Amino acid sequence: MDIYSGHINKLIEQLSRLPGVGAKSAQRLAFHIINMPQEEVEKLTRTMLDAKANIRYCKECFTLTDKDLCPICANNARDHKTIMVVEHTRDMAAYEKTGKYEGVYHVLHGAISPMLGIGPGDLKIKELILRLEKDVDEVIIATNSSLEGETTAMYLSRLIKPTGIKVTRIASGVPVGGDLEYIDEGTLLRALEGRTQL
């Protein structure tokens, strides 16, 4: 037996489809939205629709942006000869919070995972290799320390090493299986400073 009406159930069901939102959180969000003033709900809806319509990949690093180039790639003060490779935009954001990394990024949008059917062709690896045809001194591989992240790091290392470009891997300190977005800035900074050559 349903406790709530069809519209409430539909809203809860849709919200629970979001990553990290379970049934109870979806219910709390649904009731919060229902109790919001109409103008606020309309503003939230417009903001989500505008974001979906206008956010795309940066043509250089493939992070999410609303312009052709993200603010980092468009910044000439950044070191464009050093590229940090991360799995997701949220990992890039975690390193930016340290305020110490001055290079640019490349977002793969995942990691190699044969168990999930994700191979190199499903990631932005080909685009990374094309970027390396420019004047690049170092590629820092900052994938997660999970099995998939390590597999991706080794694959990239073997692919890039023959080009003569220095390839480094962030140091440990990031727990095995840990997601970078949840690691504090100090640990990320030590991992970056202690990176090792592959």
Predicted stretch roles:
Residues 16, 34, 49, 62, ...:
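Signal for well-folded cores of large energy- and translation-related assemblies
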Residues 8-17, 27, 33-36, 76, ...:
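S-adenosyl-L-methionine-dependent methyltransferase catalytic core, i.e., the SAM/SAH-binding region
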Residues 41, 117-118, 149:
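Alpha-helix N-cap/helix-start motif
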Residues 2-8, 17, 27-92:
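Cys/His-rich Zn2+-binding cysteine-cluster or related metal-binding knuckle/ribbon modules and their
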Residues 28, 43, 56, 68, ...:
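Residue-level signal for pocket-adjacent positions within structured domains
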Residues 26, 75-140:
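Extended interfacial segments that mediate partner engagement and assembly in macromolecular machines
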